Amino acid sequence: MKNNKIKKQEEIPDELLRESPKTENTAELSEQIVDWLSSGDYIPCKPEELIENMDLADHREDFITAMCELEDKGRIVSMKRGKISLTENSPYLRGIFRANAKGFGFVVPEETFSSRLDGDLYISSENTCGAVNGDTVLAAQIKSSRSGNGKSCEGIIVHIIDHELTELSGTVEPVPPLQRESRCSSGLCVRPDKSIYNFLVLLDDGGSTLPHIGSSVQVKLLSYPDKNGCASGVITEVFGESGTTDAVYASILYEYGIKPENGGGFSDALLLQAREISDRGIIYDNSEEHTGGDLEGRKDLRGEMIFTLDGADAKDLDDAINVHRDGDGWILGVHIADVSHYIKFKSPLDCEALSRGTSIYLTDRVIPMLPRPISNGICSLTAGTDRLTVSAIIKIDANGNIIGTELCESVINSKIRGVYSEFNDFIEKGTNSEYYDKYSVLGNMADDCVQLYRLLERKSKERGALELETSEAAILLDADGNPTDITVFERGIGERMIEQFMLCANTAVASCLNRKKIPCVYRIHEEPSPEKIHNFAVFAHNLGLNVSALGAKNVSPESISLILKEAAQKEIGTVVSYVLLRSLMKARYDNKCSPHFGLSTDMYCHFTSPIRRYPDLTVHRFIKLMINGKFSRKELKEAEIFAGKSAEKSNENELRAILAERAVEELYKVRYMSGFINEEFDGIVSSVTSFGIFVELPNTCEGLVPVSGMNGYFVYNEELLTLSDGRTIFRLGNRVRVKLISADIVHRKLEFSLVGTNNGDTVSKEKNHLKYNFRKKSMKNKKFDKRKNHNQMSDIKRGRKRHRKKRS
C-alpha cells in the first residue's frame, strides 16, 4: 500500500452532511453512484464534482443521503482532498475485527480484499478506534514487515461500519476508582464474562432497583466503549449469583435464545394445537365425516415385519426399517414419520419449526423443534400402533449399488421397539442373549440387516468416504442432574447399522428428487481449499505419512482416505483426524445440488429426521409434490425459492444449536472436573497454539497449559503446528502428564500445568505419536445424553476406530 501515513479517513465536507430525509429514491441512487464509481472511466473527484458529472443537481438532498449511507456501510471512502472512491479501489479494506483479551486484535479481510495481504491485519491496542470483537470495520495498512512465518502487516481502524455485539453477559461490580469520573449515577458496572470484551458497561439506575454486586446479568448496550474503556447499558435479565452453575447455564440459554420452560418454550396456543392434532390421531376410512380418511392413497405396510431401533431413553421414534433378500440383492425399507401430514405448510406450528430449525440436544435436556405431543406422540413410531409414514423402499444389488427407489406415502405398525444395547447383545450372543426372545421374532431379518449393513459399509469405504477418528463424551448425571462421570460414548453394530441405512435412504431420496427435477434442500460439503490441504499435507508428511496422493488442484475423498487409513495403521488416526477436521469445509444446506465431499457422493439430503430437523420436513413436502405430480411452473418456482430460504435459515439454526450444545457440555465438564483440583492426569496434546498447548484427558475433557507456565522460551511454528524451546517440542499427539490447576465455571475453561512427559524432556520422537487409548466403560443401564445418535453426528464419520459416528 502506497500511503502508509493514513491515520483516519478523510471526511465528506460538513456542508454535505446536514440531515436529509431518506426518500424512496435513495436505494436506487446509491446503486447508481456505485455503478458510476465502478466504471473504468471514473477518476476520483469531490462530491460536488460528482453531483455535476452525474447530472444530479436537482436531486442534491437524495444524493447527500445516499453518499452518507454508502460511507456508513463502508462501500465508499473519502480520500485525500475529499475525493470519493469505492473502498475496493482505495488504500482501505473492509473486514471483521477479532479482538484479543489484551487489547490488540486482527482484521480479517472480506474476500474482496483478502488478496492484498498474506493473512490478517494486526491492529495494536491504540489503533482499534474503540472497535469491539465482531465489528465490521474499515482499516488501513500502516506497516508491513517480513517475519519467520511470512509477511506481517499492521494497520489502523479508521471507521466502524457495524456493531455485531448488542448484548452481553457479565457480573455486577462497583465502578473502579479510575472510571468513577465517568457519568454513572448508580456507581455500578458490569464486567463482561468474555475476556475479549475488555471494557466495562456502566449502569444507570433509571430510578429502578439494580441487582446486588456479584449478580450474573445480561446487559443491552446503549453505547459502545469510549476512550476510557467504558460503555453504557441497561440490565435485561438477572441469572443469579455469578460463578454458580445455574447462573452460567441460564446465561447460555439466554445467549442462544433457548427457552426451556413450558415444554421447550412453546406458547400455550401452539401446545393446544399440538395436543389437538395428537389427540385426533389417525382418521380411518370408515369415518362418516372423512370419506377415504388419512389412509387413502397410502401403501399399507402394517402387515410387514418393521421395527424401530433407538437408544433406551429415546421417545421421538421417527424412523423404522425392514430388510429382506431380493435374489442376489436386497430390499431396504426406511419408513419415516409423516410429520408433514400433521404440520401444514405455513401453519403456526410450521412457522415455529422453521424459526427453530432443529431440536437442540443439551446435556440434561432436549429442546424440541416441535411440541412433544407431536414429536413424542402422534409422530412417534410406537410399537403396536398404526402410524403414518413416508417410505423409501430401496433396491440394492449384490455390490451395494442402489438400482431402484420407490418413494411413497405409507402406513406402518412397528412390531418391535428395538434398543441399541439389546440388539447389539442379541447379535453378539445369539441364543445366549437375554434378549433372544424379544428379537428372535425378526427371524432371518436380523442377519439380513447385518449383512446389508456390512455391504453398505464396504461400499462406503470403496467410494472413499472419510472415516475420521474422533470421540464424543457421554456425561452421566444423577437424579438431581449433577455430573457423576464422563466417559467416551461407545457405539455398537446396531448404531452403525442404522447409520448406514439412513445414509443410504438420504442418498436415494436426493437422487430421486434431482432426477425428477423437483426442488430439494440438499446437504452439501464443498472441497477444502488448496491452502488448507497444503497445510494438512505438510503436517501429515512430518508424521511420516505418504501424502503423494494429494493433488495440488484436485483433492479427492479417496486420496485423503488413503492417508487416514495409513494413519490408523500407525495408530495416529486420532491426531490426523483432528487436524483434517480443521482443514475441511463445514457441511451446509443449499437448494443447489452439489457433491458431498466427506461422504463422497454426488448428491445428498436429509430425509430421515423431520421431527427434529426442518430441512427433512421440507424434503418430505417435496417428495409429496413429486408423488402427486400435480403442480404448475409457478408452484415449482415458489418451492425452489422456499428451499433456498429454508436452507439459509437452517444453516443459521444448526450453528446456533451446535454452539449451545457445545457450551452446555463444556459447562458440565468443567463442573465435573472442579472436584479434581490438584490431581494429576495422563493426557494427549490435542491442539498447539502460540499461547500454549491444549491437553485432552481420557474422558474428553480438554484444558490449556499456558505457555507462560512452561519452563523456557517457546516458539510456535504455525506450519508444523509445534511449540518448541529448542530442547522440547510439543506437537499434536504427544502424551503428557498434567495437573489440574483451576476449573473456571464462568468461562467454562480448565487450566493445567505440566508434570512430565512419557519421553522425559524431549517429546518429539515419532514413537510418542501414538493413538490415545481412551478409557472404556460399559454404558449399559446408565443414563446419559438422550440425543439420537444416528441423527446428531456430523456428516463425516466420527468416533474411535470401532465407534465411528456420522450425521445421517
PLM regions and their residue ranges:
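Acidic, low-complexity intrinsically disordered tails
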Residues: M1-E28, F714-L720, V755-S808
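Charge-lined substrate channels and their catalytic hotspots, especially those that engage the 3′ end
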Residues: K2-G333, S340-D386, N424-I427, R671, ...
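Electropositive polyanion-binding surfaces
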Residues: E52, G206, I213, Q218, ...
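Short, acidic/hydrophobic/Gly-rich beta-strand patch recurrent on exposed beta strands
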Residues: F106-E110, Y122, C189-K194, F694-N699, ...
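Intrinsically disordered, low-complexity linker and terminal regions at domain boundaries
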Residues: D135, P706-V755, G760, K765-K780
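A generic structural signal for residues embedded in beta-strands
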Residues: A139, V219, V688, V738-L740
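Short, charged, solvent-exposed linker or helix-capping segments at domain edges/interfaces
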Residues: S169, T245-A250, G404-E406, F752, ...
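Residues that form ligand- and interface-recognition hot spots within folded domains
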Residues: F239, D313, E526, S742, ...
